[in-house]
Amino acid sequence: RLQGDWSSDVCSSDLLVYLGFSYVAFRLIHTIRDKQAGRLPSVDLSEYITYVIFFPAFTAGPIDKIERFIKDLRQPFAGLNTEIFFNAGQRLIIGLFKKFVIADTLALIALNDTNATQVNSTFWLWILVYAYAFQIYFDFSGYTDIALGIAKLIGINLPENFSSPYLKPNLTQFWNNWHMTLTQWFRAYFFNPITRGLRSWQKPMSMPMMILLTQVATMALIGFWHGVTWNFTIWGLWHGLGLFIHNRWNDFTKAKAAEWASTSFRQSILSVSGIIFTFHFVALGWIFFALSSPVTSWNVVLKLFGVN
């Protein structure tokens, strides 16, 4: 179980054990479901164990697919040439810098249970929230870079996990670029199956209601995965409802927006405004991720908008 402000304690032994076994569970479910569906490639026991407990990705992902992983594993290791060594080393150094310089520095001023109750200035509360938003990004993406760099040194090309998520113009694109392998896993093994199940019901369900149920349920489950607490539940529901609202809003305004954005300047206005709005929506959600109490979290939200 994770607690609030988890990213600042990400090196604790209990947390590493929790994360490691949760990622093992993802890999086990992936292989079991694909075996049942007849999609699992033929692998021997040593290959399977290597995939499940592959040490660079054990504690924080990314969540690789076994068919892609085995393909790399079976390639004869030709040693390290200059290009591979440089690329892997560069990725490793970038990850270390992100985690231990940028993220750990931001942690000094990032939102937490202590300063959330001590700071009453709206301006400084926004600074704390921004600091936490970037701390968690550089912390997590830094660990991913470290994992990718180490894996590349031993001949395994793990999948990317982050692609500038804070520069995306809507919440759907944010989740397609934040912890991408987790999003893909939940889409494949939870979202898509329950969507098919709802469509096969004898009693038809409206498309908006189906989208609401599937998106909220998926994000709530992702929240539970981080920890069975009210704050993680609220965080999951926040994103589930946000995804649903974006879906409905996009369907309603797509034609009008396309008509209005007839010039590159107007397209830039839409894109930049979308990026700013999406980032702030995500940043407000991080408040429930950073803090351990719903009451404290809501008080911070109110103070951010000048309501004391």
List each language-model region with its residue ranges:
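Short, exposed "boundary/linker" segments that immediately precede the start
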Residues: R1-D5
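Membrane-embedded transmembrane alpha-helical bundles that form the catalytic cores
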Residues: S8-N308
